[in-house]
């Protein structure tokens, strides 16, 4: 046990990880990086395949005991909980380019890792949507919109961007809070405590935003079904930009709020620079 440096001191029982380098060429030769990318690909494939199948199934059974909005929300939230629990120790369990983007801004992952993750997530999402299409058949898949995200009638593009931004803010803020080094040190004996709030955040965001955008909050999840449904020919494709702009803006805002306001990184940096500067 580390001793305090002075009487009455209360040393931290955790240690903040060092910031990741923006470019770490050394990790490019490590199998662990590619194993993590494979985990991101597989997890995103499963996420999109199962969640999109739930949406299509609900539309097919509408009025006949379909899952409904609550069932879809539980499918997404529960699946995120399971997949984060399974992959967090390998890749961090991002499954979402917006989450990966926020981690780059927070200096938790390097740019090469983020680029590889994002590529794996997008390819996994396309493969997951393709698998869902194979499960339901091309006709049923197209007839029920392929589970793709699109702006609901009566809502403006601006409203869609705001909904996606707010929803992603909630998700990424929860991710940062659940994986905070201080909380991880305190709750390390209960390994489900990080995936659980993340899954619940996804659930409640779906309840709030399904009526507006169908809930994207994940650019890869929106890209996969839109591509499989038809490149450049569908409403989902024309609305796709909403599901990239909103989530990336929300992710950046959540990182700034958690890292610089709640964690006080800006104040610490200012205090450190003031301490090092000469005084006259």
Swiss-Prot record:
Swiss-Prot/TrEMBL keywords: Cell membrane, Membrane, Repeat, Transmembrane, Transmembrane helix, Transport
The sequence motif named NPA 1 is recorded at: 96-98
Please provide, alphabetically and separated by semicolons, the GO molecular function terms listed in this UniProt record: water channel activity
UniProt remark on domains: Aquaporins contain two tandem repeats each containing three membrane-spanning domains and a pore-forming loop with the signature motif Asn-Pro-Ala (NPA).
Q: Which PANTHER family match?
A: AQUAPORIN OR AQUAGLYCEROPORIN RELATED (PTHR45687)
Question: Where do the TM regions start and end?
Answer: 36-56, 70-92, 113-135, 156-176, 192-212, 236-256
Per the record, GO CC terms?
A: plasma membrane
Membrane topology designation: Multi-pass membrane protein
Which InterPro entries does this one have? Aquaporin-like, Aquaporin_transptr, MIP, MIP_CS
Looking up Gene3D superfamilies in the UniProt record yields: Glycerol uptake facilitator protein
Show where the record puts the motif NPA 2.
Answer: 218-220
Would the keyword Hydrolase turn up in this protein's UniProt record? no
Pfam families recorded for this chain?
A: MIP
Cellular localization per UniProt: Cell membrane
Q: What is this protein called?
A: Probable aquaporin PIP2-8
Question: For this UniProt entry, what is the primary localization, expressed as one broad class?
Answer: membrane
Q: Of which family is this protein a member?
A: Belongs to the MIP/aquaporin (TC 1.A.8) family. PIP (TC 1.A.8.11) subfamily.
* Species this chain originates from: Oryza sativa subsp. japonica
Q: Which parts of the sequence are annotated with region: Disordered?
A: 1-21
Q: In which tissues is it expressed?
A: Expressed in leaves and at lower levels in roots.
What is the role of this chain?
Aquaporins facilitate the transport of water and small neutral solutes across cell membranes.
